[in-house]
Design a protein with these regions (language model features):
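Domain-scale signature associated with acetyltransferase and cell-envelope carbohydrate enzymes
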Residues: 1-139, 162-164, 171, 181, ...
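Short, conserved secondary-structure segments in the cores of folded domains
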Residues: 78-80, 157, 175
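Short, flexible helix-coil linker/hinge segments at the edges of structured domains or between repeats
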Residues: 142, 146-153
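Flexible glycine-rich beta->alpha loop in the catalytic core of nucleotide-sugar glycosyltransferases
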Residues: 143-144, 189-190, 196-197
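Short secondary-structure boundary/capping segments
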Residues: 151, 191-192
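Glycine-rich NAD(P)-binding loop of Rossmann-like domains
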Residues: 151-162
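A generic "structured core" feature
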Residues: 174, 179-180, 184-190
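Conserved sequence/active-site signature of Rossmann-fold short-chain dehydrogenase/reductase
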Residues: 190-191, 207
Length: 220
């Protein structure tokens, strides 16, 4: 471990997180690193590793890119379940907000650059090898309630993102959306419907989202 990394990690919060969420045999391996400027708003629910516990497997709040302020605060507000399948990088400024009874599933090789918000009231899942740029919003709820004929018409609905998906800067993904494997979502898009065709670049807002290019692949 480099000297720079040693000083970037908040070791008190790191120890607190690991020994709060993981059984002793996993916690002693320090599978989660918590970096400076990370706030624990809520440390409820549970975090489950579906893979061997390795040091630094889950990284919360590392500084990733120079154009973002190092003073930006990362927030962890979790009261539901979190499942981790492999390495996870939640860059500085990320906000994870999960309500009691909800489930957040994260596949291996998951990377968020920073300043991204994930709001989970029911279920949000990401497949393996997903990349999220900065200022992304993923939200499976409208927070407030809308009624028609005395029935709620905007209940939370699950979000499912497939494998090898790249979400561009400033994208919003709203409740009920399913995104298939091998997709790129272009910057500043607002996704409210399913993206069903693989190896495509999608872009647009709401019902205007369309395929911008087919037969593509992408690499980090």
């Amino acid at each position: 471990m480099s000297l720079k990394l040693i000083f970037e990690i908040d070791w008190l919060k790191t120890l607190r997180f690991n020994f709060h969420y993981f059984p002793l045999r996993q916690a002693v391996r320090i599978p989660a690193y918590v970096y400076w400027n990370t706030s624990f708003v809520e440390m409820g629910g549970n975090v489950h590793l579906n893979c061997p516990a390795k040091a630094g497997l889950l990284r919360i709040g590392p500084h990733a890119i120079g154009i973002k302020d190092r003073k930006t605060r990362t927030l962890w507000q979790v009261m539901g379940g979190v499942e981790v399948d492999g390495s996870v990088h939640l860059g500085r400024g990320c906000k994870v907000c999960e309500e009691k009874g909800a489930l957040l599933k994260i596949g291996e090789h998951f990377h968020v650059t920073g300043d991204t918000t994930i709001v989970c009231k029911k279920s949000v899942s990401f497949g393996k090898d997903c990349l999220l740029s900065w200022d992304v919003m993923v939200m499976d709820t409208d927070f407030h309630h809308i009624y028609g004929n005395c029935e709620e018409v905007n209940k939370p609905r699950s979000i499912a993102v497939g494998n090898h998906v790249w979400i561009g800067m400033g994208v919003t993904i709203l409740k009920g959306v399913k995104i298939c494997d091998d997709v790129v979502v272009s910057a500043n898009s607002s996704i409210t419907k399913n993206l069903d065709e693989s190896h495509c670049v999608y872009g647009g807002v709401g019902r205007g989202v369309e395929i911008l290019k087919r037969d593509i692949d992408w690499k980090r």
